[in-house]
Curated annotation (Swiss-Prot):
Record key words, sorted: Cell projection, Charcot-Marie-Tooth disease, Cilium, Cytoplasm, Cytoskeleton, Disease variant, Flagellum, Neurodegeneration, Neuropathy
Origin superkingdom: Eukaryota
Summary of the function given for this chain in its UniProt record: Microtubule inner protein (MIP) part of the dynein-decorated doublet microtubules (DMTs) in cilia axoneme, which is required for motile cilia beating. May play an important role for the maintenance of myelin-axon integrity. May affect intracellular Ca(2+) homeostasis.
Phenotype for residue 122 to N: Found in patients with a form of Charcot-Marie-Tooth disease leading to demyelinating form; likely pathogenic; does not affect subcellular location; increased protein expression; increased aggregation in vesicles; increased intracellular Ca(2+); decreased mitochondrial Ca(2+)
Free-text tissue specificity from the UniProt record: Expressed in cerebrum, cerebellum, gastrocnemius muscle, spinal cord and lung tissues.
Protein's name according to its UniProt entry: Cilia- and flagella-associated protein 276
Biased composition (Basic and acidic residues): 160-169
Assembly and binders: Microtubule inner protein component of sperm flagellar doublet microtubules.
Subcellular location: Cytoplasm; Cytoplasm, Cytoskeleton, Flagellum axoneme; Cytoplasm, Cytoskeleton; Cytoplasm, Cytoskeleton, Cilium axoneme
Keyword Cytoplasm set for record: yes
Disordered: annotated span: 26-45, 150-169
Length: 169
């Protein structure tokens, strides 16, 4: 069999180089320097070492005194101030304001807001009765337990009850 014959006879796909029938030489020149040396030369080193405005604003040390101090800034600073809350050690990170101070269930009153008085506890709204069983039940007793749709009647595990949840009587 001649080496030029294709035994599968599938059409060959054309691309930019072989569409006209002749192969073009590659216009891309090989790099002169390796990558680690080229990164130390211009313009790559200048572009890499000069921060953009966006990347400067993302920096933890960035502070702009011209930012207006409006209501939104006040609310954001009340939740988290990244100028004072960064670069803390592990023991300071684990401390939380809610756990170190008695601020549980307190709400910050912003300018122009009026806080509503807290609602009284449920015990004042309803007469709650507490009952204690005089006879201690056994923890192994199934009387009064929560009914399950499965039963432990089989040896290898649990199976479904006959009527899907309760035994028929």
């Amino acid at each position: 069999m001649p080496p030029t014959r294709d035994p599968f006879q599938q059409p060959t796909l054309d691309n930019d180089d072989s569409y006209l029938g002749e192969l073009r030489a590659s216009k891309k020149l090989p790099y002169k320097n390796p990558t680690h040396l080229a990164q130390q030369q211009e313009p790559w080193s200048r572009l890499n070492s000069t921060p953009t405005i966006t990347s400067m604003r993302r920096d933890a040390y960035y502070f702009d005194p011209e930012i207006p101090k409006d209501d939104l800034d006040f609310r954001l600073a009340a939740l988290y101030n990244h100028h004072t809350g960064t670069f803390k050690n592990k023991s300071e990170i684990l401390l939380n304001q809610k756990t170190t101070q008695d601020t549980y269930r307190t709400k910050i009153q912003f300018p122009g807001e009026f806080l509503t008085p807290p609602t009284p506890p449920i015990t004042f709204l309803a007469n709650i009765r507490h009952w204690i069983n005089p006879k201690k039940e056994s923890i192994h007793s199934i009387q009064g337990s929560i009914v399950s749709p499965h039963t432990a009647a089989t040896n290898g595990g649990y199976s479904r009850k006959k009527d899907g949840g309760f035994f028929s009587t």
